[in-house]
Amino acid sequence: MKKTLLIILFLIVSLGSFAQLGEFVVIGNNTGFKASTKANAKAIFRGKYSSWKNGESVTIVLPSTKSDNVVSVASQVYGLTVKGMQKYWLEQVFQGRSNAPVFFETDEEIINYVKRNPGAVGIVRASRSVPQSLVIQITE
C-alpha cells in the first residue's frame, strides 16, 4: 500500500512539473513558442537570447529583491544567491551581453507586464492564476 501511494505521489509531482520550472511557471507573450526544455528555459532567463525566432526582442521579467520568492528564483533558475543573481545581471548588462531584466515585486505585476509587452518572458509561482495563453510548457 505504501509503495502504491509513493508511486502515485511521484506521478502527481512529475506531471505537475511538466509545465513548471520547479515551483514556478514560465510565462511569455509573443515569444514564438509554447514549449521549451528546462535547459533552454534557464538559458533564456540567463540572457542567452536577445530576440525570439519571430523577431520580437526578448524582455526578461523577474521578481525584485523585495519579492518574497526572489530567493527561490535565484536558487532554482540561476543556481545562485540573490546577491549572486544581481551580480550576474550587472556583469551581463555592463559587458553588453544582455539588456537588463525588468523587476517587479509581485507575481501579479509580472503577469500584467508580460501580458502587455510582446516578447516579454517571466517567471511566477505555480500557485498563481495565469492565463493559459501565456504559459510556456517546460519539459525535461
Where are these regions (language model features)?
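Flexible loop/hinge segments at secondary-structure junctions
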Residues: 20-140
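Sec-dependent N-terminal signal peptides
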Residues: 4-16
